[in-house]
Curated annotation (Swiss-Prot):
This is Neutral protease 2 homolog ACLA_052720. SUPFAM superfamilies: Metalloproteases ('zincins'), catalytic domain (SSF55486). Belongs to the peptidase M35 family. Secreted metalloproteinase that allows assimilation of proteinaceous substrates. Shows high activities on basic nuclear substrates such as histone and protamine. Residues 20-172 form a propeptide. It is an enzyme of class 3 (hydrolase). Its EC number is 3.4.24.39. The keyword Zinc applies. It catalyses: Preferential cleavage of bonds with hydrophobic residues in P1'. Also 3-Asn-|-Gln-4 and 8-Gly-|-Ser-9 bonds in insulin B chain. One of its GO terms (biological process) is proteolysis.
Length: 349
């Protein structure tokens, strides 16, 4: 990993936990093709009550996040956008969506802006997962969503004409290395990440089976070995500040740090970037179970990077309640599950 910093100017953020509602609502997503690679999503609250949820990493997010999964011949097409981690308390109103029972909203986006579809041909599009519910601007639960599946006959030439959402030449001012208080904070976070990831790897291999099952829903030796391998890879990456597979920015190179985003990863380039509130809102290490901190945020982001351990993780369940409700296969592919497990091992939760 190579450390880099750039000038950034964004505002403030924080953290939290989850609790499933008594009568769990759900969101239904209807996908349709507008033209070639341009897609419309209609999101409907199918529950009996009004819900408010975070739409970061979801439909309505203006950033190039993963809203749908794309498949060609049953193989997933690599995603070229960003995966971000946001605070789970103190959320600003502009990243929250409120839907009355039966209400809908629409979102239109071009899937070719975050995936290479220049080959053309048939592409299958679908989406499912959970999004965080909120109360008083704090994550308080989660709501599942699922979509229909559509097949698109993609014109490769037209797809090639769609501008990429992220242009690597558009980076802001880049300074040679981290400096000052941010350099100190990040170096501390990286050292803590090494310790947390190694301890969590050992716990995955031979620690409490009940704790492992709490997060990964199995005690199989194969799964424990897989989790340990990813965590040890994270520890190696965090310990290599002048080499390694990732480039780590102390600031925001692409302008995706809004006032609620702690950090983000560009998996296609193995780039990790911290946002202002990573430094202002997070402690170096959490003192309570399931809380966010700098070290587990860095750990979370490293699991997204396929250069650290392939394949990189997604964001399938955010926060303790959502993450521990996932199946084994989804937990293995969920960044927050690794961060939460490391926190639990560190604090003996």
């Amino acid at each position: 990993m190579q450390l880099t910093v750039l000038a950034s100017a964004i505002l403030a953020l924080a953290q939290g936990a989850l609790a499933i509602p008594a009568k769990a609502p759900a969101l239904d997503v209807t996908l349709s093709q507008i033209d070639n690679t341009r897609v419309k999503a209609v999101v409907k609250n199918t529950g009996a009550e009004e819900v408010t949820f975070v739409h970061l990493n979801f439909f309505r997010d203006a950033a190039p996040v993963k809203k749908v999964s794309l498949f060609r011949n049953a193989t997933e097409v690599p995603f070229n956008g960003i995966k971000l981690r946001f605070r789970n308390k103190g959320l600003t109103d502009d990243v929250l969506t409120t839907l009355a029972a039966g209400a809908t909203f629409e979102d239109e986006f071009d899937i070719a802006s975050t995936a290479d579809l220049t080959e053309g041909g048939v592409v299958t599009v679908r989406s499912q997962g959970v999004v965080p519910l909120t109360k008083d601007n704090k994550v308080s639960g989660y709501i599942p969503f699922t979509s229909n599946e559509i097949e698109l006959e993609v014109d490769g030439a037209k797809a090639a004409a769609v501008p990429a959402a992220i242009n690597l030449l558009d980076r802001r001012t880049k300074v040679a290395s981290c400096s000052g208080s941010r350099a100190t904070a990040l170096q501390t976070a990286l050292r803590n990440t090494v310790s947390l990831a190694n301890a969590a790897a050992s716990a995955a291999e031979s620690g409490s089976s009940s704790r492992f099952s709490e997060y990964f829903k199995t005690t199989s030796s194969a799964t424990r070995s897989t989790v340990a391998a990813r965590l040890r890879a994270v520890a190696r990456e965090a310990g290599s500040t002048s080499s390694g597979k990732t480039t780590y920015y102390c600031g925001d190179p692409y302008g995706y740090c809004d006032p609620n985003v702690l950090a983000y990863t560009l998996p296609s380039k193995n780039i990790v970037a911290n946002c202002d509130i990573y430094y202002s809102d997070l402690p170096a290490l959490a003192r309570s179970c399931h809380a966010q901190d700098q070290a587990t945020t860095t750990l979370h982001e490293f699991t997204h990077a396929p250069g650290v351990y392939s394949p990189g993780t997604d964001d399938l369940g955010y926060g303790y309640q959502a993450a521990t409700a996932l199946s084994t296969s989804d937990a293995l592919n969920n960044a927050d599950t690794y961060a939460l497990f490391a926190n639990a091992v560190n604090l003996n939760c």
